[in-house]
Design a protein with these regions (language model features):
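Conserved Rossmann-fold NAD(P)-dependent oxidoreductase catalytic core, especially the SDR/UDP-sugar
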Residues: 6, 26-30, 34, 73-76, ...
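Conserved SDR Rossmann-fold cofactor-binding beta-strand/turn motif
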Residues: 31, 147-152
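Non-catalytic, hydrophobic alpha-helical segments
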Residues: 12, 66, 136, 146, ...
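Active-site beta-alpha turn of Rossmann-fold NAD(P)-dependent dehydrogenases/reductases
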Residues: 70, 105-108, 149, 198
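NAD(P)H-binding glycine-rich loop region in Rossmannoid oxidoreductase-like domains
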Residues: 29-98, 185-189
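N-terminal Rossmann NAD(P)H-binding glycine-rich loop of SDR-like oxidoreductase domains
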Residues: 1-25
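Structural motif
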Residues: 2, 64-65, 103
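Active-site-lining helix/loop region of Rossmann-like oxidoreductase modules
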Residues: 153-211
Length: 211
């Protein structure tokens, strides 16, 4: 499968480019600057430089799937959350439809189901994620929305807990989020579903196929 990864130079994105390549997929790695190109090549991706705040439709041409893992980043203001986390995601939803990339995975966030209940400083981010998620649900694409808990840089354990609603908060290593995305990509049972993701005791493949 040829997969466009948005946010490829992010911490989840770098794990994802490597894992997808190792699994035999062709990865088009969307990055925002030329100085990120060598790293993408080292990870096995085919880099493409584009700004999610500008025109990006062409980046999905020839792809079978899109994984949106981009974001405004920690410390960015509400405006950046709107232009990247919402508008950037929506642009690539439209691009996926235009170019026939029928599979779309969204890296959302735990708390996006009810942004107003989150911490005040997180609400602009959660609102942007929620709005992008809703557009994806209405897109007609074979979508899956993945909502991880608080992200850490610990080494992944390969074990998670996944369910439409877990009823608790918690953490998960970014590496395990990337592994869960890899498993979800080809799991037809996840089409049209939204699920939360935390560290747990179930091997990732089993957790995903059990959704």
């Amino acid at each position: 499968m040829r997969v466009l990864v948005a946010g490829a130079n992010g911490q989840i994105g770098q794990h994802l480019v490597r894992l997808l390549t190792e699994a035999g997929h062709k990865v088009r790695a969307l990055v925002r600057s030329e100085d990120q190109v060598p790293n993408m090549r080292n990870l096995g991706g085919e880099p493409i430089v584009a700004d999610l705040e500008a025109e990006v439709s062409y980046t999905a041409a020839g792809c079978d799937a899109v994984i949106f893992s981009a974001g405004g980043g920690p410390g960015s203001g509400a405006e950046k959350k709107e232009t990247i986390d919402r508008q950037g995601a929506v642009k690539l939803i439209k691009a996926a439809r235009e170019h026939g990339a029928n599979r779309y995975l969204m890296v959302s966030a735990m708390g996006a189901a009810d942004p107003e209940s989150g911490p005040e400083k997180m609400q602009p981010y959660l609102r942007a994620k929620a709005r992008a998620d809703q557009v994806l649900k209405e897109s007609g694409l074979a979508y899956t929305i993945v909502r991880p808990g608080s992200l850490t840089n610990e080494t992944g354990t390969g074990k998670v807990e996944a369910a439409p609603s877990l009823g608790r908060r918690g953490e998960i290593p970014r590496e395990d989020v990337a592994r869960a995305l890899l498993a979800t990509l080809t799991a037809e049972n996840t089409h049209g579903k939204t699920f939360e993701l935390l560290s747990g005791d179930t091997p990732i493949d089993r957790a995903i196929t059990s959704l």
